[in-house]
Amino acid sequence: MKLKINIRPNEIIFLICIVVIFSFSYTLTYFDSPIFKEHYITNNGNDFGVENHFVTYHSTYKEDIHKRIIDPHHGLIQEITKTFYPVSSPLEKLFSFSDNILIVLIIVQVIVGFLIFLLSVEKLSKCNYQLKSIFSTKSTFYINNNNNNNNEDINNNNNNNNNNNNKNKNDERNNEEIEDEETIRKEKILIIKKKRDILLAIIIFFLVLLGVLTIIYVSFIPLNIRKAFIGQQFYYKGSIDPLCADISNEGDHHIGKCKSLNGRIGNVNDKIFGYSWSLDSGLFNVKIVFFSTILIEFLTGCLILLMKFKKDPNIVPLTKPSIASPTQIPHLFCIAK
């Protein structure tokens, strides 16, 4: 068996582009999005001021809920800001559209993975020129018919050695049957090639669709956050306890930061702020897309390599159909190019 691996440059570029795209998308999942900016709380004597610095999207639809909690024992003031977008909001519609794309993307990935898996297994298990399809029965019929005809010809030749005219007629008939068998075999190979081209076209179509959906979904990653944004800020009126500590959560993941001259809030210039873009469920979805796409890339690469395996066409008899059998008919992806 001859092994020829001939990978074209465009195939290498295609695989590199896929890896780069999903590596970039994976990096984005751990990147702090600047969609929601910091919320500053500054000390101003016995009072405080709240400065909300949002990078607003569709501010007309945005609704804020403020809640202030004062701890009388420690003088801790907790400001909770919850920002959400109604159903009529364009951003809310964008979230829904992104979720729908994710569902379609996962479905397409399942289809592509299933097709590539089947074709890869079929390639590995049936490259011994075994054809188990509707053609096998017909092939057996034709081959058995030819074998019977050949046996009859041999008997006629043995019984009529002195009859040259009959022998010539039998030879002509055998030649015609050989030509017919070779024609039938070539037609079957042509049909097999057409089946292969159709399946490859289906795979290419789904791969292109997968790429388009993935690019669209990756472009939505910075906005693929939870529908509600919750931010918490803390302000301590005294200067006896450090405030640059963990900021507690309010039903969502948060990223909290504190900026102070001495690690405590007690001066006018000291400020504490926190921001979040909550990717708890979104991060899980992105990881699903990332790892499932890596699996699709692996299966696609295996299929591309398997498609490059070529057998010596001399193994398949082209001029002696009388000794051919169904196991000698090239299979779907085992035809030498």
Swiss-Prot record:
Ranges of Low complexity composition bias in the record: 148-167
Compartments reported by the entry: Membrane
Extracellular side stretches: 32-100, 219-285
Highest taxon listed in the record's lineage: Eukaryota
Keyword Ligase among UniProt keywords: no
Transmembrane segments: 11-31, 101-121, 198-218, 286-306
Stretches for region Disordered: 148-179
Cellular component per GO, a single term: membrane
Keyword terms, alphabetized: Membrane, Transmembrane, Transmembrane helix
Residue ranges that the Swiss-Prot or TrEMBL entry lists as coiled coil: none
Main location: membrane
Topology of the protein relative to the lipid bilayer: Multi-pass membrane protein
Cytoplasmic side: 1-10, 122-197, 307-337
Protein name per UniProt: Uncharacterized transmembrane protein DDB_G0284909
Organism listed in the record: Dictyostelium discoideum (Social amoeba)
